Curated annotation (Swiss-Prot):
The lineage of its organism: Bacteria, Pseudomonadati, Chlorobiota, Chlorobiia, Chlorobiales. The keyword 4Fe-4S applies. Belongs to the radical SAM superfamily. This is Bacteriochlorophyllide c C-7(1)-hydroxylase. It catalyses: a bacteriochlorophyllide c + 2 S-adenosyl-L-methionine + H2O = a bacteriochlorophyllide e + 2 5'-deoxyadenosine + 2 L-methionine + 2 H(+); a bacteriochlorophyllide d + 2 S-adenosyl-L-methionine + H2O = a bacteriochlorophyllide f + 2 5'-deoxyadenosine + 2 L-methionine + 2 H(+). Involved in the biosynthesis of bacteriochlorophyll e (BChl e). Also able to catalyze the same reaction for bacteriochlorophyllide d (BChlide d) to give rise to bacteriochlorophyllide f (BChlide f). Residues 104-359 form the Radical SAM core domain. GO terms for molecular function: 4 iron, 4 sulfur cluster binding; metal ion binding; oxidoreductase activity.
Amino acid sequence: MSTKRVITKEDIHLKARLLSEGAKVTVNKPPASGFNPFRAMVLNGSDLATLVRQEPYTRLEVQVNGDDVEFYDCGQHLASGRMQEAFSWRSGKLSNGRPVDAAVIGMNQDIINIHYSYSCDNNNTGRSCRFCFFFADQHIGVGKELAKMPFSKIEELAKEQAEAVKIATDAGWRGTLVIIGGLVDPSRRAQVADLVELVMAPLREQVSPEVLNELHITANLYPPDDFKEMEKWKASGLNSTEFDLEVTHPDYFKAICPGKSATYPLEYWLEAQEASVKIFGPGRGTTSFILMGLEPMNIMLEGVEERMSKGVYPNMLVYQPVPGADMFRMPPPNADWLVEASEKVADLYIKYQDRFDMPLAKDHRPGYTRMGRSQYIILAGDMLAYKLQEQGYELPEAYPVC
């Protein structure tokens, strides 16, 4: 990682192109830890992390030479980079002999998912979010069986997850723990607080209170029927919620997230976020993923601004077509659209930063709101970092390395 990061507009535009167009990837020599197409690549100098979706019909090319990568446009060299640093502790073993990697399903550089469920009822009933791939390759019969996994088995897996987090944090990792699992089976919807406690208890036992207090621990759950239930989540050790809207307009919400919409209308999700602001606080305490590219820019920006005005911190993922998802054939927006939208979102972050719990440039806490953070499918955060850099702030590390 660079000793001093400098982000340029060219870096941002190249990342936008990679997220929009993908690239033809040639692995001349595999990285030391092996080549994984979902592992981020990093632009040297700016340390912007980006997903590089493999696409055969694009001008962009990436040459992988061990841990070094080179980016080209029809043979013209654009930039140099590297594979995102691998965590050595992920290749270790748990106390029961199982690989650490097996316990941290879906982890990326600064997020560890803590599963309280291994199946989404929307997938099991044909109502998945149309872009979602988490359970897309899970047979419905298997999903329905996993949806009723005994609590004793969930607890056993939770202990493995907690041990993996202990190994990670002992190695210096700091980031976001995401309590995740989609929509639980109808028979368990009154037991969500119990499931949260089931996975949080081993974390409290294995990880010191001092370290847990440093981490961003968020509930990527569906809103509860009674908003007061969030107080129970907080008592279990969560310090944030993440009620992901995905889109901001009711019509798009119904069309793209049929299961979410059938469970609760968009208005209820908005009310849940506002209740979270009161319980967990604004900014880092109340976040939401929104996908750039699923609705017109003006509609998205209006919705994002309204949420920020209420203290909600939107994390703007760039929509990516993923095999298995219903919307797989829909491409992302072009790079210029992404750059323009990201710049406007960054301006909104700055405009509404007094509604969050900490000034943007002073937020060095692990988590979604950390100043200078570069996440591999988020461009608006990079644009915000660029604007803060232009205001004279020195950028910290883009992501954890340990």
